[in-house]
């Protein structure tokens, strides 16, 4: 009887450890303010989908996510699916051996970036995530963004015809998969056209 109880306890501990890695990945992405997070582990690969809307520039957000995810101990192969308006745009694969080398100090983060696989073919990652519930959905969230606009118009090579600097505040919201709403106004700051503003 004791043997059955101990085998069952070891089995349950093993199952909880298997479930711990996807939870760690999900929590790490949540702490980094990523949106539309989906994480699943299948066949020694953790597939995670997310949107990097909180960071200036999508690639900056991807780099920050990779830096934090490869630091998670005992992480298997990572397959990252980058989303834009809830549509998959990029699939990044980081092999477990590369993560282990980085954690052991045998390679730098730059080498991880150089050796990771990157493709726009996202079908396999999307199939892995089919049926997985999304966390931190961006649906209905309103973002306030300010875009600077610099305009230089030259119709002839020897004279600057028009120059202007504008601020363009916008309210953006994701509606459904692949669709977003942007309401934007243009506020002129400086212009070389007399009487225009």
Regions found by a protein language model. Name each.
Residues 4-15:
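Sec-dependent N-terminal signal peptides
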Residues 20-43, 55-57, 116-117:
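N-proximal, solvent-exposed amphipathic alpha-helical segments enriched in charged/polar residues
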Residues 45-91, 123-197:
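Transmembrane beta-barrel domains of bacterial outer-membrane proteins
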Residues 11, 39, 135-137:
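Sterically constrained small-residue positions within well-ordered secondary structures
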Residues 22, 88-90, 96-127:
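Flexible, glycine-rich linker and terminal segments associated
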Residues 16, 44-45:
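Generic detector of short, well-ordered, non-transmembrane alpha-helical segments enriched
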